[in-house]
């Protein structure tokens, strides 16, 4: 029996090895049986993007106030869709106007939407809630605006410098009936001044407190940008050039360019900008149904084919008299444009922080 056991083990081992070798050398199956997963039906959802991109040779000309952007396919330039327009994955809404595409009305495809306004976050100041974009005055010294949860304020009281050296003891005091403090000159001398300022004349200083408006330092801020890029708008400034030496807001009418004239068609061949546009015929200004008593031939700022914008470079303010159908008349200050220049620093008239940016370099100017 002892010699029979090793022989049996050797035979079993050889048989197992033959089975493994036969399995390894057997041909692999040529087909596999499986059930594919059902594909998603996309026929009901249109495809708005096509690849490769097919773009027109030149970008479109957008109306004034409409952004020229890259479409949602990241292919071509397009005029952004505006509030209430239809939008898709290709035709996107104007991001510079805070618009987004609302697909809620196209369930369940969610393919075509409508451009809607993004509702910004309101603000709370001293327990009072303000809406996004709302301007308000928490007190008589500041004018504030709520901007998406943040409050930005501009002072209404001018931080003028103290009186000149001839006023030995200047101090700020509260004047009854006025919000902002004013400088007064308190002179302790009991004798006449040796050197009186030229703009006030010679007078005796007897120790009394004289109102600072008698020593008024005239200040006038620059005019703000026109409130509209085309058509009739308003610009404002602050000035204390008045009998009370009190800062007051002044306003004037402005019209940078007409909305109903396509100035792009007037740009000469080979040029990219038309800095100034002037109609050939004179016209009368109209305001609230009233007509100016005389005709004018105003100049307007033009437009560019690229990303530059044209703004007034030399201008002045004129008084225009209006006559109404009922016989009443009035006059208004109006911006009169003499020259314009075109540059890359296009700023939003509603941006209260635009003045913090640097002035455009002269290399960007194109007359």
Swiss-Prot record:
The UniProt family comment states:
Belongs to the CCN family.
Q: Where is the TSP type-1 domain?
A: 215-260
* InterPro entries assigned: CCN, Cys_knot_C, Glyco_hormone_CN, Growth_fac_rcpt_cys_sf, IGFBP-like, IGFBP_CNN, Insulin_GF-bd_Cys-rich_CS, TSP1_CCN
Q: Which residue intervals define the domain CTCK in the entry?
A: 273-347
- What subcellular compartments does it reside in? Secreted
Q: Which PANTHER family match?
A: CCN FAMILY MEMBER 4 (PTHR11348:SF4), CONNECTIVE TISSUE GROWTH FACTOR-RELATED (PTHR11348)
Q: Is Aminoacyl-tRNA synthetase set as a keyword in this record?
A: no
Function, in words: Downstream regulator in the Wnt/Frizzled-signaling pathway. Associated with cell survival. Attenuates p53-mediated apoptosis in response to DNA damage through activation of AKT kinase. Up-regulates the anti-apoptotic Bcl-X(L) protein. Adheres to skin and melanoma fibroblasts. In vitro binding to skin fibroblasts occurs through the proteoglycans, decorin and biglycan.
**SUPFAM superfamilies of this UniProt entry?**
FnI-like domain, Growth factor receptor domain, TSP-1 type 1 repeat
- GO MF: heparin binding; integrin binding
Question: Can you tell me which residues are glycosylated?
Answer: 86, 143, 284, 343
Q: Which residues form the IGFBP N-terminal domain?
A: 45-118
Please list the tissues where expression of this protein has been recorded.
Expressed in heart, kidney, lung, pancreas, placenta, ovary, small intestine and spleen. Isoform 2 is expressed predominantly in scirrhous gastric carcinoma and, weakly in placenta. Overexpression is associated with several cancers including breast cancer and colon tumors. Isoform 2 is overexpressed in scirrhous gastric carcinoma.
Q: Spell out the Gene3D superfamilies in the cross-references.
A: Complement Module, domain 1, Thrombospondin type-1 (TSP1) repeat
Boundaries of every VWFC domain copy = 121-186
Tell me the protein's name. CCN family member 4
Keyword Metal-binding found:
no
Give the organism the record lists.
Answer: Homo sapiens
């Amino acid at each position: 029996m002892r010699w029979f056991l090793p022989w049996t083990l050797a035979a079993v081992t050889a048989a197992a090895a033959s089975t493994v070798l036969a399995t390894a050398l057997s041909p692999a199956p040529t087909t596999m049986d499986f059930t594919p997963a059902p594909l998603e039906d996309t026929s009901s959802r249109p495809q708005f993007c096509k690849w490769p991109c097919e773009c027109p040779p030149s970008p479109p000309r957008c109306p004034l106030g409409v952004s020229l952007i890259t479409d949602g396919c990241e292919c071509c330039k397009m005029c952004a869709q505006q509030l209430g327009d239809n939008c898709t994955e290709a035709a996107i809404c104007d991001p510079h106007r805070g618009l987004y595409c609302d697909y809620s009305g196209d369930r369940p495809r969610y393919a075509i939407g409508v451009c809607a306004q993004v509702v910004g976050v309101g603000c709370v100041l001293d327990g009072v809630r303000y809406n996004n974009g709302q301007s308000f005055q928490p007190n008589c010294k500041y004018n504030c605006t709520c901007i998406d949860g943040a409050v930005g304020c501009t002072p209404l009281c001018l931080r003028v410098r103290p009186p000149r050296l001839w006023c030995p003891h200047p101090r700020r005091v509260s004047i009854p009936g006025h919000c902002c403090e004013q400088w007064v000159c308190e002179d302790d001398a009991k004798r006449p001044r040796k050197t009186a300022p030229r703009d006030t004349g010679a007078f005796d200083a007897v120790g009394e407190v004289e109102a600072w408006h008698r020593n008024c330092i005239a200040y006038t801020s620059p005019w703000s940008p026109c409130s509209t890029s085309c058509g009739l708008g308003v610009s404002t400034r602050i000035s204390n050039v008045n009998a009370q030496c009190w800062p007051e807001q002044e306003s004037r009418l402005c019209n940078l360019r007409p909305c109903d004239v396509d100035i792009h068609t007037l740009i000469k061949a080979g040029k990219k900008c038309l800095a100034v546009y002037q109609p050939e015929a004179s016209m009368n200004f109209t305001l609230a149904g009233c007509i100016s008593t005389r005709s004018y031939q105003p100049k307007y700022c033009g437009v560019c084919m690229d990303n530059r914008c044209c703004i007034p470079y030399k201008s002045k303010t004129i008084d225009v008299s209006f006559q109404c159908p009922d016989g009443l008349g009035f006059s208004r200050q109006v911006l009169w444009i003499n020259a314009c220049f075109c540059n890359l620093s296009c700023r939003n008239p509603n941006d209260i922080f635009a003045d913090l940016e640097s002035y455009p370099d002269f290399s960007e100017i194109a007359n």
